[in-house]
Regions:
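Cytosolic regulatory regions of ion transport systems
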Residues: 1-452
Length: 452
């Protein structure tokens, strides 16, 4: 399959890396020669310099024979024109555009056919929804749902006083009094798929699969006290700050939004009547004290600068704020969380690229292909949802008898409406849904790819 990526920024480069790794043919368009040279030195990709929305440039990229065009260049209008032009040249092409302006949201949805769009993605809105999910379920750093919401993969940090500290994974269920499965552990930035003898240490981040009911019991039994978030401080009034404040203010949460630019504060106040908008420097510790940071249930740092967001998050942790969420734009910075001991880290660009990759995979979906794909642990691991069909191997055989690929495991089996966290005796049959966790380097196009 041939994919054209218009725009070689952070998202475009991230998509180039991911799609090339999966064997897709990629053509990259950008008007910056230096950026293109950097990409061609790093990746085996064809590069075309020029205006992404220009018919001449798109024809040079051979858009007539392309299956998909992804427009993640400059402004929204530019991306839309790029998609419309590509569709004009090749009516059969799929098109994806990044649209970030809040005012365009509903309009794009209603006029998708007019703009010749197969899908529109909004990194900031997607990140806002992800952060809202984290705030709704305190106690976890991250939470992804599968099997129509009946099973989940959550991220927890092992603290010094945790009941799980210095405990072998095989003994974990006796402590949590819940049936859970540890599918991955991140220690010092390195992610591994542990066995039962793996000893959990302070600072480890563990990724646990369980049903929603079992997770609730797990938190209670390991002594993690959770309470509903009532007061949130958002530091940064950009698009992401606006989307998050808008979402949270729909409920009964007291939202305080801090922004340094006065004109932007006025604009935010006009659009967010139920939000307390304050003009000030969120990187100033005394200012945060004056705004009552110590009284907040959660602090979300989402300024334009990763370094400032990390400083704000460290301030919040110093005041013992229960939930601290840090936005990063550079994915390599998300790994610093292990060093600094930060809480939840959200990367809008990573979420956006993952959503697009899921669409690309769905375009090529075949019998046994993944129904959904979620990346976690900084993209080093993936959780894939498969439906068992007549072509699936080893139906009815106990899991302990199967030979799976290295760094791949079956984390959940959903029998109709009944999810099961499997053990060696578990089996699956036609119609069941499997959640498979695998190393991000392991490409699983079909369910049968997990078997050796």
């Amino acid at each position: 399959m041939k994919v054209i990526i218009a725009g070689a920024g952070k998202v475009g480069t991230m998509l180039t890396r991911k799609l090339l790794a999966e064997g897709y043919e990629v053509v990259l368009i950008d008007n910056n020669q230096q950026v293109l040279e950097t990409c061609t030195e790093r990746y085996d990709v064809m590069a075309v310099r020029g205006n992404c929305a220009s018919m001449e440039t798109l024809e040079e990229a051979n858009v007539k024979k392309a299956d998909l065009l992804i427009a993640v260049a400059g402004g929204d209008e530019y991306n839309l024109l790029c998609c419309m032009t590509a569709h004009g040249i090749n009516p059969n092409i799929h098109t994806i555009a990044r649209i970030r302006t809040p005012e365009y949201g509903e309009q794009i949805y209603k006029m998708r056919d007019v703009f010749a769009l197969s899908m529109a993605v909004n990194p900031e809105r997607q990140a806002a929804l992800e952060i809202e999910r984290i705030l709704k379920y305190p106690g976890f750093l991250r939470r992804d749902t599968f099997a129509r919401g009946r099973a989940e993969i959550v991220e927890l940090k092992i603290r010094e006083d945790s009941k799980l500290c210095n405990v072998a994974i095989k003994d974990m269920n006796s402590i949590t009094k819940s049936k859970v499965l540890v599918c991955a552990v991140r220690r010092d930035g390195v992610v591994s798929a542990p066995d039962g003898n793996y000893i959990l240490k302070e600072g480890d981040r563990i990724f646990v699969t369980a049903t929603s009911k079992e997770l609730t019991g797990m938190l209670k039994n390991i002594g993690v006290i959770t309470h509903k978030v009532k007061r949130v401080m958002i530091c940064g009034g950009g698009k992401l700050g606006f989307y998050l404040a808008q979402q949270l203010s729909k409920g009964d949460i007291d939202v305080h939004l801090i922004e340094q630019d006065m004109n932007r504060c006025i604009e935010l106040s006009n659009h967010l009547p139920n939000v307390s908008v304050v003009c000030g420097d969120a990187s100033n510790q005394m200012f945060l004290e004056s705004e009552g940071i110590e009284k907040c249930d959660a602090v979300v740092a989402m300024t334009r600068f990763d370094e400032m967001n990390m400083i704000i998050s460290l301030y919040a942790q110093n005041y013992n704020v229960d939930q601290v969420i840090t936005k990063v734009d550079h994915t390599e910075n998300s790994r610093i969380q292990d060093i600094l001991g930060l809480g939840s880290v959200v990367c809008p660009k990573e979420l956006c690229s993952n959503q697009i990759v899921r669409y690309v995979r769905a375009m090529e979906s075949t019998t046994g292909a993944a129904l959904s794909i979620h990346s976690f642990a900084d993209g080093q691991m993936e959780a894939l949802e498969f439906r068992v069909d007549e072509e699936t191997l080893h139906c009815g055989e106990p899991l302990k008898a199967l030979n799976l690929r290295k760094n791949a495991l079956i984390a959940c089996i959903s029998h109709g409406k009944l999810p099961e966290i499997p053990d060696g005796e578990s089996t699956f049959n036609v119609g069941d849904i499997l959640v498979v966790v695998a190393n991000g380097d392991v490409v699983l196009h079909t369910l049968n790819d997990i078997f050796v």
